[in-house]
A protein has these predicted regions:
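Donor nucleotide-sugar binding/catalytic pocket of nucleotide-sugar-dependent glycosyltransferases
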Residues: 52-93, 170-174
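A short, basic/aromatic alpha-helical/loop segment that forms part
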Residues: 117-122, 133, 138
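Nucleotide-activated donor-binding/catalytic signature segment of Leloir-type glycosyltransferases, i.e.
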Residues: 136, 147, 153-215
Length: 215
């Protein structure tokens, strides 16, 4: 190694950090981890890894409780929640907020934030949304997918076409030219920007800044 860390901290999923448990240098650094715990129960192998860390943090009380219920010898320190930024506060006027984004103020939007990967059940999501629309017959309900396309996962145009959702699926676009974010119906991976009119608007997923999405 070109450096000798005293503390190694991992804030990521188990499969991205478990190798450090087996590191030949493990005895020479303090290992602090903050694993993503969003389901219960956790895989026992994951719990064994968490139990070997010197310090363990959680994103939420749910994560803390899940880990400690499965192993009460984990060196748990505290819940380290994200900063309480006003970016995450609800919009004061939802109808006006929708209007500012060019969306019908009376619309009902069901949203999801997840990367377009094969393990994410986008086909099930869109098929279920189609059934919901058929049952409710409500013209003002839309599915908002904050994700990436194209990516390593699903073929969005195919899923939308198969389920007849061309006018019901909204996505986040970000312009490479003016850097502004907009929300629009899925048309293609690239389209004209609503702000600067350049043909450089592309679907932007998890990396779009929260402040930009709020704008």
């Amino acid at each position: 190694l070109d450096f000798k860390p005293d503390i190694v901290m991992d804030i990521r999923d188990w499969w991205m950090m478990e190798f450090e448990q087996r590191s030949p240098f493990r005895d020479f650094f303090h290992w602090a981890i903050m694993p993503t715990v969003d389901a219960s129960p956790q895989n026992q192998q994951w719990i064994n890894t968490y139990n070997s860390a010197d310090s363990v943090f959680a994103y939420s009380e749910f994560g803390r409780d899940t880990m400690l219920e499965q192993c009460d010898t984990i060196n748990f320190i505290d819940v380290a929640s994200p900063a309480a930024s006003d970016v995450f506060a609800p919009a004061a006027d939802k109808k006006q907020h929708k209007a500012n984004m060019g969306i019908n103020p009376e619309s009902i939007i069901l949203g999801t934030v997840m990367r377009n990967q094969k393990r994410k059940l986008y086909p099930d999501l869109m098929a279920s949304f189609r059934k919901f629309l058929d049952q409710t017959q409500d013209p003002n309900v839309f599915l908002y997918c904050h994700t990436y396309y194209p990516d390593v996962g699903w073929d969005f145009p195919k899923l939308i076409h198969e389920n007849g959702l061309a006018s019901r699926v909204l996505v986040t676009y970000k312009c490479k030219n003016c850097k502004k974010v907009s929300v629009d119906f899925f048309q293609n991976s690239i389209q004209n920007c609503q702000h600067c009119q350049s043909h450089t608007n592309y679907i932007k997923g998890i990396g779009a800044a929260e402040t930009q999405k709020r704008e």
